[in-house]
């Protein structure tokens, strides 16, 4: 065992796998109307919706520019945005705020 790695400040040297958890509060950089159009246009193909929305995901943008999570990669996102639904429904926010569907807790 290489004990110098055990005390390294770089967690990628110290562990085989690292999991980041939390509400990072990154959003999709599109208007609610634009996101709704994308979802309607590709209603029969969720993976196309996901791919198109991820092009505008704030976390992906700063990650791709090398601003955060150096040395890490994110697994492929294969699920629809999880934020924000009306309570006890699968309907995205219909309140006056009309929050943009996003992956705020990936």
What residue spans do the PLM features occupy?
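Catalytic lobes of large eukaryotic enzymes
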Residues: 1-106
